[in-house]
Amino acid sequence: MFNPHALDVPAVIFDNGSGLCKAGLSGEIGPRHVISSVLGHCKFNVPLARLNQKYFVGQEALYKYEALHLHYPIERGLVTGWDDMEKLWKHLFERELGVKPSQQPVLMTEPSLNPREIREKLAEMMFETFSVPGFYLSNHAVAALYASACVTGLVVDSGDGVTCTVPIFEGYSLPHAVTKLCMAGRDITEHLTRLLFASGFNFPCILNKAVVNNIKEKLCYIALEPEKELRKSRGEVLGAYRLPDGHVIHFGDELYQVPEVLFAPDQLGIHSPGLSKMVSSSIMKCDTDIQNKLYADIVLSGGTTLLPGLEERLMKEVEQLASKGTPIKITASPDRCFSAWIGASIMTSMSSFKQMWVTSADFKEYGTSVVQRRCF
């Protein structure tokens, strides 16, 4: 039987990303735990030496990658591996947060244009597998905008698996104007890996995605003017990185050429507009009455937007694409890799949010389709 007092306790918040899952409790200023969205299953039928485990989660899986088959249950922002996702949530509930899911409501962020079947499967799993008392799906971009104390604006969201521009008006996303690019941080990391091998750097540790990802995060940047940067830096060493095995790799213009694919996806054979044109395209699909409001509140969200130089390059190109004299403001919070989680924490801590929960009683009466009517 549903207990309404179960909604009075702090909610568990999951921000499920292709690369990272962030978990914590509502009302807190940031997620308590951030783990890699990966599971490692033993390559052999016996548990890993001296450990009674058949699978490993997050960083532990990445650390033991040579003995494991790595599975990423979220691809391009969408849950695709449900069995592995269940294990990951179980790990977060029990091992990381130390809570009983049957005693606390759960809010999950979801990507824009999340398919109906995935939304309903999420609700089904939370209510039937984990027996949560309440559940809510919040649009990832809406939550990120909320963290910036705005309800109208355009969110530029780029994480590990997908990049999208999402116009939001008075707290609701405008699906017809969402622009999505199936390319983000993971693709930049893979592009850098290919470049390292092509340059003759075939050290075994480069096979470890975490190492190359760290190189990207520490050294790569977005050039304000790529062609001018190329003329200026050709042949120069722009950065160096010491690998775990002690070898030192020196880098030149590839440090800005690799992430340039965000603004020129055709370099990876992806025939889609780059980031600046995505912003312009999304805004132009909206009613003319709100276009200036969207330009005036562009909010960056997601770990890939932390690349140095991205904010300045985006501002320069959006100014060129917008009508002359259009006021443009870009907000780039230092903690924007967690902005959706933070926004969800703020939302769920408000007393008015209690009426938003889809309760276990609602689920029992209406079934999985209840999320279509209540979460938007």
From Swiss-Prot:
What changing residue 124 to K does, per the record, is:
Found in a patient with Bazex syndrome; uncertain significance
Which UniProt keywords are present, listed alphabetically?
Cytoplasm, Cytoplasmic vesicle, Cytoskeleton, Nucleus, Transcription, Transcription regulation
This entry carries the following GO cellular component terms, namely: acrosomal vesicle; actin cytoskeleton; cytoplasm; nucleus
GO terms for MF: chromatin binding
Domain of life per record: Eukaryota
Q: Which GO terms describe its biological process?
A: negative regulation of DNA-templated transcription; regulation of DNA-templated transcription; regulation of smoothened signaling pathway
Q: In which tissues is it expressed?
A: In skin, expressed in the basal, spinous and granular layers of the epidermis. Also expressed in hair follicles, sebaceaous glands, eccrine sweat glands and semen.
SUPFAM superfamilies attached to this UniProt entry: Actin-like ATPase domain
Where does it localize?
Cytoplasm, Cytoskeleton; Cytoplasm; Nucleus; Cytoplasmic vesicle, Secretory vesicle, Acrosome
Similarity section: Belongs to the actin family.
Spell out the PANTHER family in the cross-references. Answer: ACTIN (PTHR11937)
Q: Give the protein's biological function.
A: Negatively regulates the Hedgehog (SHH) signaling. Binds to the promoter of the SHH signaling mediator, GLI1, and inhibits its expression.
The record names the disease as:
Mutations and insertions in the coding sequence or in regulatory non-coding elements of this gene may be associated with Bazex syndrome; a cancer-prone genodermatosis with an X-linked dominant inheritance pattern.
According to UniProt, the name of this protein is Actin-related protein T1
Q: What is the lineage of its organism?
A: Eukaryota, Metazoa, Chordata, Craniata, Vertebrata
